[in-house]
Amino acid sequence: MSFSSKVKSEVCRYDDYSKGEAIAVLSAVMKASGTLALEGNRKISFKIITENPAIARLIFKLLKKYFDIHTEIMMKKSNSLKKNNVYVVSITEDMGVRELLKTVGVMKNEDGIVTLSYDIPEFVVKDDESRKMYIRGAFLGGGSVSNPEKMYHLEFVTHNEDYASNLRDLINTYGLNSKVIQRKNSYVVYIKEGEQVVDLLNIIGAHSSLLELENIRIIKEMRNNINRLVNCETANLSKTVNASVRQIESIKLIEKQIGLSRLPENLREVAKLRLNYPDESLKELGKMLEPPVGKSGVNHRLRKIEKIAEELRKEGR
């Protein structure tokens, strides 16, 4: 099961709603994944289509409990290439679909023409809990969240630009920074930062999934920190090795051209130690001197040796 499906299944296990909260959930689900159909004799029907059976069962329960609508769940094969099962909840004229659509703020009637409303009515999101439940419904109807092992991305797919903007504004009342982009014929409200994805999961009540994501975030951060440390250590080691090789080349050049005995005693001591201990750090070389010398002192002497070697190279010796 994908992480997105796990989140939706977790959220659907909660079904203790007040009627106002149930209206908010249904309103958002129906706008995200519902279709209005005109039947014969000026009758209408409404279908909610989902690939997640838990969502279909939740809709069935809410309709039965709060609206006394006894509908059915039909299962059929999707028209997509994957041929997944899809679940269809149909609400007909005889079941009271018109009253339901008005109650949840999905339908509007202009000049006798019945159309879907893409506003988010204030009476549907009148308090904090109903706002959270609306966002939950929008996620169940058209949302998805990426596998946090790979990336942090949560989105809501809508089919109307104004509705996408309204949903974005509602989400952002919780201090989030969701944005809208157009993707082919859809308008997508999305969040990309890990911390904000966590916040939104908290808003919709997906607490177990939230903890799973947080654990993944912690592990990923630890891995990144370890990788940074390893890269830093590797870079430092490479730098030390390159410096040691360069210093040894300079010392051998001096030894060949004029002999180490021509060097001042303090430089000669460091030169011999570097030849004998090519892998040691400057700090360790300094400890071997008598009296001991600090890292900067050893570095200063080796720089003098390299300068002498450079002069010999210029002279062509």
UniProtKB/Swiss-Prot annotation:
It holds the Pfam family HTH_WhiA. GO terms for molecular function: DNA binding; endonuclease activity. Belongs to the WhiA family. The keyword DNA repair does not apply. InterPro entries: Homing_endonucl, Intein_endonuc_central, Sporu_reg_WhiA_N_dom, Sporulation_regulator_WhiA, Sporulation_regulator_WhiA_C, WhiA_LAGLIDADG_dom. This is Probable cell division protein WhiA. Keywords: Cell cycle, Cell division, DNA-binding. It comes from the Bacteria. One of its GO terms (biological process) is regulation of sporulation. Residues 281-314 bind DNA. Gene3D superfamilies: Homing endonucleases (3.10.28.10). Involved in cell division and chromosome segregation.
